Amino acid sequence: MDSKTALIGMSGGVDSSVAALLMQQQGFSCMGVYMRLHSVPCGGANHSADAAAVAQKMGLPFQVMDFQDAFQENVIRPFVSSYESGLVPNPCIRCNRTMKFGVLLDRALDMGYRYVVTGHYARIRQEETTGRYLLYKAADRAKDQTYFLAGLTQRQLAHIRFPLGELTKEQVRRLAQDNGLLTAGKKDSQDICFVPDGDYVAFMERYAGKAYPAGDFLDLSGKVVGRHRGAVAYTIGQRKGLGLAMGAPVYVCGKDMVKNTVTVGPNEALFSSALRGCDWEWYPFPALTAPMAVTAKTRHSQNEQPAGVYPEENGFARVEFECPQRAVTPGQAVVLYQDDLVIGGGTIAQAL
């Protein structure tokens, strides 16, 4: 396999366009690929046509590859199942692990390409003494995407390139403008790609072919205080849209999917001093064997919080925060850092 070959995942946006440009400038033999994952229109934009136009301008071979069946199996079905079981999943993390760097990587290797390249903002380095591939934050902290990438395996990192990791977004747009790429001024996408209107409950009802039944709101003592429109419609920490008049603000504190109840309470009831995480991927070492001081994020938008991580049995690890954290939500990712280095990423199994 030629080490200077790369399959470029081109989304039709400016980041993947510049990633393709940089790999070509570095002397790689490249091919552009647009992954067709679903049939949901995204604001009328023709992303595949934009990707094709950029590839044509660069003289790159280009294909649209249909991965809709794999996306249904690996992302949408688990997304719906997780919500129905009371979790709040992050489909972008699962898509990165199973699709962009899962089925697309497998396809790339089968075609003889050494690397899959995307426009993510992150950095990968190989540690000389251990040979392990390490994941680092991007130079542009405001655009860093390591929270969404911390489920990638060593095998995957060995075949991934992130050429934007050392650049700022401003530099990326300038490169696109200087090279006449039509995506230079294109806005970044924000929403879950298969739920562009943000109404994930309506999406799940269409997907599952059913309506989720109404149930009871309970206070912390278990008293019925109102009716809700289906437990799947609520997330931990939610205040808006509850339709409850209780004399003081209340927030979603918990859900019982078997009984179809949603528990509400005051803001102070939302804070947790620790969490238990599962399905960990560790980067400096194969497994956590001793406690470590880290900083932790339980949401992408959150500032890192000082914490300690402690190994537990059966691959679990406990994260204890210096200060209690609000709305720690099972199903979401927890990512641990030391400075720029990602120590590990897992899934929140339980708030403690």
Show the residue positions of the predicted features:
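AMP-forming adenylation/ATP pyrophosphatase catalytic core
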Residues: 119-352
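ATP-dependent adenylation/nucleotidyltransferase module used to activate substrates
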Residues: 1-150, 161, 169-171
